[in-house]
Structures are given as structure tokens and as C-alpha cells.
């Protein structure tokens, strides 16, 4: 994938600063356009990655019970306003035939999917779909909780408001007891 054009971003940020009545040449702002460009390169790093590659290596274990990695911190940028949203993801799956992934791989998939202009709903669904396709588990459950700056610093101005999304696949969709177990473990400290 081609690299992010930092100079083009810096030029655009300079135009934005001028459009809001600022002087992009003043001391505090002189380097801001390139700082923003470097920040975008970092926060949009997921655009250059295929998150599914994290599941290219699967381990065959004698484990067919629930696997849950909870409180995976993530951040993303709202594609509607280009302001951050951030929170935690809880990712659970039920291995099939002992097929398990390294635990860090679940967090890496969340990071790669999040680091692009995005919607929380799409992150949640994409993580679940990648896991279903690559791990071939009996089921997947992804729950994400996030605070969106587009609701905190503008518009309705409601700091502290959390948005919760879920994607439920396979056994978790059909088994209330299994789904309840995941929810109880997420709440448990």
C-alpha cells in the first residue's frame, strides 16, 4: 500500500488554520501542519495493514473452552468528524478442534482495524468477521465500549457518554448461557 502523503496533509492543515483565521506562521503553529501529518500517519497506520495476517499462525491445543481477552484499550478516528474515539474491546471466542491464536493477536487485530478513519460499529463487526474466517471457531463475541469526542466536545456536548457495540457469531448467538458467561466475565474484575 502506498505511503501517507505527509506533505499534502501538512499543506491542507495550513489551509485549515488560515480558514479559521489563524496565522500558521506564528510561533506556536509554525510546525503544527507537519506534526498533524505525522500524527495522521500514526493514527491511520491500519490503512496500510491487513489485520487478518495476525491469524496466519494458529496453534493446535487441547482447549475447546471459552477464550476471552478483555479490556483491550483502543483508539480510532471517527470518519464523520475526524476526531478521536477511544475505549476498550472485549474479544471472546470458542475454539473448534483445538485451534487457538496467540492472545496478543486478538489485541493486534483490534489495533489494526481501529487505526483508520472508522466507525465503532464497523470495527466491532470486522474483528468478529476476521476471527470467524481465520480461526474457524464455534463462535465469536466482540463487545466494544468507547467515548466519542464527536459527542463530547461538539454537537450534544455529553462528556462521559459511552457507546457500546457488539458482534455475536456462531455458538454465542444461539446459546444464552454461553453469552451470559462472557458478559459475567467481562463485568468481573
From Swiss-Prot:
A Pfam family of the record is GTP_cyclohydroI
Q: Which amino acid positions bind Zn(2+), per UniProt?
A: 78, 81, 150
Q: Which residues form the signal peptide?
A: none
Give the catalytic activity. Answer: GTP + H2O = 7,8-dihydroneopterin 3'-triphosphate + formate + H(+)
Sorted alphabetically, the keyword list is:
GTP-binding, Hydrolase, Metal-binding, Nucleotide-binding, One-carbon metabolism, Zinc
Q: Which GO terms describe its molecular function?
A: GTP binding; GTP cyclohydrolase I activity; zinc ion binding
GO CC field: cytoplasm
- Pathway the protein takes part in: Cofactor biosynthesis; 7,8-dihydroneopterin triphosphate biosynthesis; 7,8-dihydroneopterin triphosphate from GTP: step 1/1
Documented EC number(s): 3.5.4.16
Kindly give the NCBIfam families that the UniProt entry links to this protein.
folE, PRK09347.1-2, PRK09347.1-3
Q: Which family does it belong to?
A: Belongs to the GTP cyclohydrolase I family.
How does this protein assemble? Answer: Homomer.
List the protein's name: GTP cyclohydrolase 1
**Organism source for this protein?**
Listeria monocytogenes serotype 4b (strain CLIP80459)
Amino acid at each position: 500500500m502506498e505511503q501517507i502523503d505527509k506533505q499534502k496533509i501538512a499543506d491542507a492543515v495550513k489551509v485549515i488554520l488560515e480558514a479559521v483565521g489563524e496565522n500558521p506562521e506564528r510561533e506556536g503553529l509554525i510546525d503544527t501542519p507537519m506534526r498533524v501529518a505525522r500524527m495522521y500517519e500514526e493514527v491511520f497506520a491500519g490503512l496500510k495493514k491487513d489485520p487478518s495476517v495476525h491469524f496466519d499462525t494458529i496453534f493446535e491445543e487441547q482447549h475447546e473452552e471459552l477464550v476471552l481477552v478483555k479490556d483491550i484499550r483502543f483508539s480510532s478516528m471517527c470518519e464523520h468528524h475526524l476526531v478521536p474515539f477511544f475505549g476498550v474491546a472485549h474479544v471472546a471466542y470458542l475454539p473448534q478442534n483445538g485451534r487457538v491464536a496467540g492472545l496478543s493477536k486478538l489485541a493486534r487485530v483490534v489495533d489494526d482495524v481501529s487505526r483508520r478513519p472508522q466507525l465503532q460499529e464497523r470495527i466491532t463487526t470486522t474483528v468478529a468477521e476476521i476471527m470467524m474466517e481465520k480461526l474457524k471457531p464455534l463462535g465469536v463475541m466482540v463487545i466494544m465500549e468507547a467515548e466519542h469526542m464527536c459527542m463530547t466536545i461538539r454537537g450534544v456536548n455529553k462528556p462521559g457518554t459511552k457507546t457500546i457495540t457488539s458482534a455475536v457469531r456462531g455458538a454465542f448467538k444461539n446459546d444464552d448461557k454461553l453469552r451470559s458467561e462472557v458478559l459475567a466475565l467481562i463485568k468481573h474484575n
